[in-house]
Amino acid sequence: MLKKIISAIALIAGTSGVVNAGNWQYKSLDVNVNIEQNFIPDIDSAVRIIPVNYDSDPKLDSQLYTVEMTIPAGVSAVKIAPTDSLTSSGQQIGKLVNVNNPDQNMNYYIRKDSGAGNFMAGQKGSFPVKENTSYTFSAIYTGGEYPNSGYSSGTYAGNLTVSFYSN
């Protein structure tokens, strides 16, 4: 049976063994302006977010940002998904919303790009990992909603949940 040892959703005060792994805002995810990383890792830098710079509107299947993680000792499974994601066509779809224009949003799913273990794009649930192994995931653009053609520059915010489990 898997035991959850680290959760990104909440830090439960006074509970040993539970550590907040991050609830992140992608604060400068601009379409036409260079962006800068704004992520504070909370578990010895085990997880980090790397945004992507845009010169134009994202195209379908474009990479919005990447997630790199090194699995801490004692961890045998990971769950990674956009917080508050919806299931569509068997995938968990998250949303990045323009802070200044909430009508504009980018839908995406998480895809595993490297590392051992099987993980299908947008998969629900946890998947097996090996401790001290590095993994790379990408947030892949699947479309969006906007009132006019193209996105405006601005801050696109969203949350990602990463949970680590041990046997």
Curated annotation (Swiss-Prot):
It is found in: Fimbrium. Its main location: other. It comes from the Bacteria. The keyword Transport does not apply. Keywords: Fimbrium, Signal. One of its GO terms (cellular component) is pilus. Residues 1-21 form the signal peptide. This is CS6 fimbrial subunit B.
